[in-house]
UniProtKB/Swiss-Prot annotation:
Disruption phenotype: Destabilization of ComFA. It comes from the Bacteria. This is ComE operon protein 3. It comes from Bacillus subtilis (strain 168). Keywords: Cell membrane, Competence, Membrane, Transmembrane, Transmembrane helix, Transport. Induction: Expression activated by ComK. Pfam families: Competence, DUF4131, Lactamase_B. Signal peptide: none annotated. Gene3D superfamilies: Ribonuclease Z/Hydroxyacylglutathione hydrolase-like. InterPro entries: ComA-like_MBL, ComEC_N, Competence_ComEC/Rec2, Competence_DNA_uptake, DUF4131, Metallo-B-lactamas, RibonucZ/Hydroxyglut_hydro. The lineage of its organism: Bacteria, Bacillati, Bacillota, Bacilli, Bacillales. To H.influenzae REC2, N.gonorrhoeae ComA and E.coli YcaI. SMART domains: Lactamase_B (SM00849). It is found in: Cell membrane.
Length: 776
């Protein structure tokens, strides 16, 4: 049939359009445009019917799936026998897992371990066990900072609606379901390798054998991600291809017929998917292998495009939410790009040339997705893949698999093998982290405008088509357009005339970002931070939570900010400077500004030492100084000299004018400090007050409010914080003076956006803000 080869690809594209249109209705217009292009290009009625049917099917499928994605439970305390649905993860004194209720609803459960002895006992809990659990249901947190990971949305797309804070685990019985037997085997391999492997090897070997990256060090994993080689630590088509080809060869050599070998492999693949964690890349590779094997059984020669389109459609039929997963998108985008460009590889005769083309096309195919989800890519991703892919394929991957098999046969020989293998892994990890540490290799782009991203994706497709046709004229035109769009994506923030002030929701602490129009000044005032206490060794976490890593750096990255023009620290309390070292070590700061007398204790010196090590200029300021940071100007109102009796009253107090409004930023200033500011500046006024010390009763005096006459007060405080900030007396005072109050603990990140001295307050995450959004 004419154009028959287009049926499955067009059906897959229409399925994508249907799900996207159901989730984001304006996408329906793109589908109409898509149908018009098919009509003009092919005039093939049957193809249009197939596309339309696929679109309607997946539109309805997503709508029905989403409407049924609700919970039958309410917030409160529940006790019943639940099934442990995943391998429990123990990190320090916390155990986390998914549990399944008697009516098959799944929850994200977490348990605080009480003692080292209990921790040892919990290691024996297996997936599939039924345990009597008692705990409280709480709603998962939404992302309250732009760019940060949205845990609520992540769970929602797994049909999970609750966090279950478990207080008691009792009477666990053995699993019976076969699926859980496979998961128990996976857990056994993880525990087995944890106990016998050297630290550097453990995480890498587990990632390559069972698809678990939990024990890969955070620094190493981040480095792999920055350089665009993190796919090496995922079970992918390469692993599945090598495994199926190897097993097929062994079975043929053992005298098993090709048909029986294919059937055995078809039975084996689902087990392998469960054993390796069922990540999108594994599902895609296993399904494609299954299509090839099934085709061989019925004497049907399956084309690669057919296999990948069938796999894509089947996965979306089972779970349309897959479409919105970064891993799913990357796996299929790269595979589609390589399959559609297969004729290019055949024209290149040398292995090095083919490796170069494969790396280049994979990079091009993944680039729009990388920019959308992660806002950055490495310019040396192609050469790094050319170097690392063969090395992992022929050395690290076989070594990891062989080492685990050897370890299971003989612990002594296995340890001997891993003693040298660990040296190799350590050397590779150091190489990767050192290269990733070179900032010049990373290109960072602000969250792309949808129109520019769509245009960029289209130009990449046209560029790949031009490469395949070997048309120099088309290649020059599409390559030029592609580079132009890429350049526009890169400079887009510099073209924007919008400025901003953001009070970032970092819990019980302070962190404010001030950005001038056209990126002419990017300043962070304080970093927030969590109080750390010394604890027993068994409570120490392998992956401790970091506001800098999980909140501030993603926030800056989403804005395309590779480096701040200045980091201003108001005073040396942990909840204001706790993440400064992380920002400095990630090369995020050009200039560090501190108040006079910043160091009052030996521990306060740590931040300054980190700045010196990174070559960051340190500037000490006092009352009367004016900070000029490109187009941003800050007037220093306090301190004149440090207050030996109070760190809070030694806070750096700043006054600025931006977006047509005057702002006073008070750090943790208390009433005594406020009085001193009024004495020195008796005519000081401010439209916006950043309330001192998170709204404690020791700050924000009546005289200060009467003097400033603010219209808006911003309070940064943690949700349900132990200090009960902000204090009711402060809130009542602000209410008496008819001052609008915006709070991070209730509203999330508080945003002020302005153009030409006219601005608007809003909050993140956005919702009906008619009561707080107001144009200046």
């Amino acid at each position: 049939m004419r154009n028959s080869r287009l049926l499955l690809p067009m059906a897959a594209a229409s399925a994508t359009a249907g799900i996207t249109a159901a989730a984001y209705f304006p996408a329906i217009f793109l589908f109409i445009l898509f149908l018009l292009i098919i009509l003009i290009k092919t005039r093939h009625a049957f193809l249009i019917i197939v596309c339309f049917f696929s679109f309607i099917l997946f539109f309805v499928l997503y709508a029905v799936t989403d409407s049924q994605n609700v919970s039958s439970y309410r917030q409160g305390t529940y006790q019943f026998k639940a099934v442990i649905d995943t391998i429990p993860k123990i990190d320090g004194d916390r155990m986390s897992m998914m549990v399944e209720t008697p009516d098959k609803e799944k929850w994200a459960a977490a348990y605080r371990i009480q003692s080292a002895g209990e921790k040892e006992q919990l290691l024996y809990i297996e997936p599939g066990m039924s345990c009597e659990l008692t705990g409280t249901l709480e709603e998962p947190n939404h992302a309250t900072v732009p760019g940060a990971f949205d845990y609520n949305e992540y769970l929602y797309r797994q049909h999970i609606h609750w966090n279950y804070s478990v207080t008691s685990i009792q009477n666990c019985s053995e699993p019976e379901n076969f699926k859980y037997k496979v998961l128990s085997l996976r857990k056994h391999i993880i525990s087995f390798t944890n106990s016998l492997l050297p630290p550097d090897s453990t995480g890498i070997v587990q990632a390559l054998t069972v698809g678990d990256r939990f024990y890969v060090e955070d620094e190493v994993l981040t480095a792999y991600q920055k350089l665009g080689v993190v796919h090496l630590l995922a079970i992918s088509g390469l692993h599945v291809g090598i495994l199926t080809a190897g097993l097929f060869y062994i079975m043929i050599r053992l005298g098993i017929t090709r048909e029986k070998a294919s059937i055995l492999l078809l039975l084996f693949l689902p087990l392998y998917v469960m054993l390796t964690g069922a990540a999108p890349s594994v599902l895609r590779a296993a399904l494609m292998s299954g299509v090839y094997l099934a085709g061989s059984l019925v004497k049907w020669r399956v084309r690669s495009a057919t296999a990948i389109c069938l796999s894509y459609i089947v996965l979306l039929l089972f779970n349309p939410y897959h479409l919105f997963e970064a891993g799913f998108q990357l796996s299929f985008a790269v595979s589609f790009s390589l399959i559609l460009s297969s004729s290019i590889f055949q024209q290149v005769k040398t292995s090095l040339g083919q490796l170069t083309i494969v790396s280049l096309i994979a990079q091009l195919g993944s680039l729009p997705i990388l920019l959308y989800h992660f806002h950055q890519f490495s310019i040396i991703s192609v050469p790094m893949n050319m170097l690392m892919v063969p090395f992992y394929t022929f050395c690290i991957l076989p070594g990891a698999v062989a080492g685990v098999l050897l370890l299971s046969l003989s612990a002594s020989f296995g340890r001997l093998f891993f003693s040298w293998f660990d040296l190799l892994i350590s050397w590779i990890n150091r190489l990767i982290t050192n290269i990733a540490d070179v900032d010049v290799f990373t290109i960072m782009i602000a969250h792309p405008a949808p129109v520019l991203l769509f245009l960029f994706t289209v130009t990449i497709i046209l560029l790949l088509m031009a490469i395949e046709k070997r048309s120099l004229s088309q290649l020059m035109v599409t390559g030029g357009i592609c580079c132009t769009v890429m350049f526009l994506l890169f400079i887009y923030p510099c073209l924007s005339s919008e400025g901003e002030v953001d009070m970032i929701d970092i819990g019980q602490g302070d962190s404010m970002f001030v950005g001038a129009p056209h990126q002419r000044g990017r300043v962070l005032i304080d970093t927030g931070g969590t109080l750390s206490y010394s604890s027993e060794p068994w409570r120490e976490k392998q992956h401790p939570f970091s506001l800098g890593e999980k909140v501030l750096i993603p926030f800056l990255t989403a804005k395309g900010i590779k480096q701040l023009d200045a980091l201003i620290l108001t005073h040396a309390d942990q909840d204001h400077i706790g993440e400064a070292e992380i920002l400095l070590k990630h090369h995020k700061v050009k200039r560090l500004v501190i108040p006079k007398g910043f160091v009052s204790e030996p521990k306060d010196e740590k931040v300054l030492q980190a700045a010196r090590e990174e070559g960051v200029a340190i500037e000490e300021v006092k009352r009367g100084d004016v900070l000029q940071i490109k187009d941003l100007q800050f007037h220093v109102l306090s301190p004149e000299a440090p207050d030996p009796a109070s760190k809070n009253n030694s806070s750096l107090v700043l006054w600025m004018e931006t977006g047509g409004m005057s702002w006073i930023l008070t750090g943790d200033l208390e009433k005594e400090g406020e009085q001193e500011v009024m004495n020195v500046f008796p005519n000081i006024k401010a439209d916006v007050l950043k309330v001192g010390h998170h709204g404690s009763k020791g700050s924000t005096g009546e005289e200060f409010i009467q003097q400033l006459q603010p219209k808006t007060a911003i309070i940064s405080a943690g949700k349900n914080n132990r200090y009960h900030h902000p204090h009711q007396k402060v809130l009542q005072l602000l209410q008496r003076h008819s001052i609008r109050v915006l709070r991070t603990d209730q509203n999330g990140t508080i945003q002020y956006r302005y153009k030409n001295r006219v601005g608007t307050f809003s909050v993140y995450p956005p919702y009906d803000t008619s009561d707080i959004t107001e144009t200046n």
